[in-house]
């Protein structure tokens, strides 16, 4: 049995040490949990340019990716890659694709690229693994269901990392056009550059518009405005 004074000092020391580390551990654990929950709310924005929309024969020729938080703030810009495809496939594209991909310089860039589809998937998968937890963050974009079809087929490991749900800005657009036609007239118009990174940036800006002008304000924001208005009325009176 420990002697009184020595024992009490040792016990106090052990207890104090554990108490301090225990509290710090709780704080660090809480911070880690909050960070994990925050990361789970992120959105994985993707845009593809393809040789066409036929999933049986067409291929991905450009892909870009951005990560935003739940408030649509851009947190990270991922790879923006042009993927090599055979000239025969490019020559068989529709007139629309030949015109727009030719005008944007994408066709020429594809011919000059040395990046394979497998290399591209590895780059994008590495990026989203660094930025998002597995299986929790949804794919986001404009008419992103079309992109998803190609990603499911050609980049299955990338898609396996994401949540099965998607956030499609075009759905919000169509609802806004029907339910809020006056506000819809002020929605940002797409420049139609038909380049992946530009299209993602436009999609994020468009959803920001709908959020700010169509979706109702958060309760806390409403309360703040009510308080501010009340203070202003007191000042005026």
Swiss-Prot record:
Mg(2+) 1 binds at residues 47, 49, 199. It is an enzyme of class 3 (hydrolase). Mg(2+) 2 binds at residues 47, 147. It is found in: Mitochondrion intermembrane space; Mitochondrion matrix; Mitochondrion; Cytoplasm. 3'-to-5'exoribonuclease that preferentially degrades DNA and RNA oligonucleotides composed of only two nucleotides. Binds and degrades longer oligonucleotides with a lower affinity. Plays dual roles in mitochondria, scavenging nanoRNAs (small RNA oligonucleotides of <5 nucleotides) that are produced by the degradosome and clearing short RNAs that are generated by RNA processing. Essential for correct initiation of mitochondrial transcription, degrading mitochondrial RNA dinucleotides to prevent RNA-primed transcription at non-canonical sites in the mitochondrial genome. Changing residue 96 to A: Loss of 3'-to-5'exoribonuclease activity. This is Oligoribonuclease, mitochondrial.
């Amino acid at each position: 049995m420990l002697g009184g004074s020595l024992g009490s000092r040792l016990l106090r020391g052990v207890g104090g040490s554990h108490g301090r580390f225990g509290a710090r551990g709780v704080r660090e654990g809480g911070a880690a949990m909050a960070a994990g929950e925050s990361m789970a709310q992120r959105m994985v924005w993707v845009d593809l340019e393809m040789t066409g929309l036929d999933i049986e024969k067409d291929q991905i020729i450009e892909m870009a990716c951005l990560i935003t938080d739940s408030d649509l703030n851009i947190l990270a810009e991922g790879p923006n890659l042009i993927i090599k495809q055979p000239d025969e496939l490019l020559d068989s594209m529709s007139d629309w694709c030949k015109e727009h991909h030719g005008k944007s310089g994408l066709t020429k860039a594809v011919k000059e690229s040395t990046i394979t589809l497998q290399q591209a998937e590895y780059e994008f998968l590495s990026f989203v693994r660094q930025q998002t937890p597995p299986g929790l963050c949804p794919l986001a974009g404009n008419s992103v269901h079309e992109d998803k079809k190609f990603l499911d087929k050609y980049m299955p490991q990338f898609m396996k990392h994401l949540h099965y749900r998607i956030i499609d800005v075009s759905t919000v657009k169509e609802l806004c056009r029907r339910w809020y036609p006056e506000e819809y007239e002020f929605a940002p118009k797409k420049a139609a550059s038909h380049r992946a990174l530009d299209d993602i940036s436009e999609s994020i800006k468009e959803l920001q518009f709908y959020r700010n002008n169509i979706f109702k304000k958060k309760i806390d924001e409403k309360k703040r405005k009510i308080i501010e208005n009340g203070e202003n009325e007191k000042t005026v009176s």
